Amino acid sequence: MIRTNFLLKQARRHESKDKSSKRHKSEEHNDKEHSSDKGRERLNSSENGEDRHKRKERKSSRGRSHSRSRSRERRHRSRSRERKKSRSRSRDRKKSRSRSRDRKKSRSRSRDRKRRIRTRSRSRSRHRHRTRSRSRSRSRSRDRKKRIEKPRRFSRSLSRTPSPPPFRGRNTAMDAQEALARRLERAKKLQEQREKEMVEKQKQQEMAAAAAATGGSVLNVAALLASGTQVTPQIAMAAQMAALQAKALAETGIAVPSYYNPAAVNPMKFAEQEKKRKMLWQGKKEGDKSQSAEIWEKLNFGNKDQNVKFRKLMGIKSEDEAGCSSVDEESYKTLKQQEEVFRNLDAQYEMARSQTHTQRGMGLGFTSSMRGMDTV
């Protein structure tokens, strides 16, 4: 195996030397061709220069008739130069293309050789005899592992992707999970402590409110101080509000309901509002009638239809004729006067209506026709 590897290495070296010598030869040949092309161009240019000089001397003796021929010659020369330049450029391009092709072919050949060598070495290693000692097989397997690992390391260094950090006995992901679990446990403990404190405060407030509702708020606060419990400003405020509620209840007889916040409701104002509500919504008694109500009930317009309409509009219940007959003399006189007044008003209304509808062109109404109103 070692001998075959050594022979393969020597064969690769000879091939690389042959390739380099071939490349140098091809480059020298191309340089020579390029220099020869340049020399030819220089000779052509020098010859063209001499020809030009001679032609100028000849043409100086000639007249203006040959000016057109000169311009044609110049055009022909410029075209020939351009053609030569384009030819030289095309040659250079062809040479560069041929070089690139040669390189590609050499690369493909070297790849094919490498593949063949690998396949041969694999086939030989597969078909080896199995009767050799275990120590030799182990040493060979170690050598193979080393050879396989070397190009892999080289390829990893060439690759752009960063390699993962080596394992040094501690896993960072597991450490992060453990830290998170510890934080969660601490947060749970803190939350439980806060809940306990809140429950204790609520109990203290309820005790203080209950003690204040009984009436002896100051005594209860003193008792709490004597017992050693801490009296917070909230407890003191609740006791004060309970004392105010007890005072309002004693004066007005109206207590503030439990669903109201005692710190936000004034008990005296609440009692006044409740009194007003009761007066508004309580039912009227039968015997209580004011004088104005009696006058409106006994009002008479001199016409039964008008009386019925008025009572319906005002919400007055109709009384019996027997009740109406039993009336005092004073009330009877007032009713008579009301009837006369309403009759006069009706007559005046009819007169005004007839004048406004029939005599429109009589001015603003302050004429002799309005004198009849006084006589009525």
UniProtKB/Swiss-Prot annotation:
Cross-link (Glycyl lysine isopeptide (Lys-Gly) (interchain with G-Cter in SUMO1)), chain numbering: K317
Keyword annotations from UniProtKB, A to Z: Coiled coil, Isopeptide bond, Phosphoprotein, Ubl conjugation
Chain segments carrying region Disordered: 1-171
Superkingdom field: Eukaryota
Coiled coil spans: 171-214
Position(s), cross-link Glycyl lysine isopeptide (Lys-Gly) (interchain with G-Cter in SUMO2): K317
Leader sequence segment: none
Chain intervals with Basic and acidic residues compositional bias: 13-52
Record-linked Pfam families: SMAP
Phosphoserine sites (modified residues): S45, S318
InterPro entries: SMAP_dom
Biased segments, Basic residues type: 53-155
Family in the record: Belongs to the RSRC2 family.
PANTHER family, per the entry: ARGININE_SERINE-RICH COILED-COIL PROTEIN 2
Name assigned to this protein: Arginine/serine-rich coiled-coil protein 2
Source species of the chain: Rattus norvegicus (Rat)
Gene: Rsrc2
